[in-house]
Every structure is written in structure tokens, then in C-alpha cells.
């Protein structure tokens, strides 16, 4: 199970890639 921290980190990284 991914923790909120891991999820947030992945989400931020995805946003950076998209941007």
C-alpha cells in the first residue's frame, strides 16, 4: 500500500513531467 507521502511525491513528479 502506497503511503500519502509516496503518492504525493509521484503526483508532483508527474505534474513536473507534464509541465
From Swiss-Prot:
Peptidase M12B domain ranges (all copies): 10-19
Gene Ontology molecular functions: metal ion binding; metallopeptidase activity; toxin activity
Gene Ontology cellular component terms for the protein in this record: extracellular region
Binding note for cofactor: Binds 1 zinc ion per subunit.
Family indicated by similarity: Belongs to the venom metalloproteinase (M12B) family. P-III subfamily. P-IIId sub-subfamily.
UniProt-recorded name of the protein: Coagulation factor X-activating enzyme heavy chain
Keyword Secreted belongs to the record: yes
Tissues showing expression: Expressed by the venom gland.
Subunit structure: Heterotrimer; disulfide-linked. The heterotrimer consists of 1 heavy chain and 2 light chains (lectins): LC1 and LC2.
Function of the protein: Catalytic subunit of coagulation factor X-activating enzyme, a zinc-protease enzyme that acts in hemostasis. Activates coagulation factor X (F10) by cleaving the Arg-Ile bond at position 234 and is also able to activate coagulation factor IX (F9) and protein C (PROC) by specific cleavage of Arg-Ile and Arg-Val bonds.
Catalytic reaction(s) noted: Specifically activates several components of the blood clotting system, including coagulation factor X, coagulation factor IX and protein C by cleavage of Arg-|-Xaa bonds. Has no action on insulin B chain
Modification comment: N-glycosylated.
One GO BP annotation of this record: proteolysis
EC number: 3.4.24.58
Superkingdom to which the source organism belongs: Eukaryota
Keyword Metal-binding attached: yes
Organism (species): Daboia russelii (Russel's viper)
Amino acid at each position: 500500500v502506497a503511503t500519502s507521502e509516496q503518492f504525493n511525491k509521484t503526483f508532483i513528479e508527474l505534474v513536473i513531467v507534464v509541465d
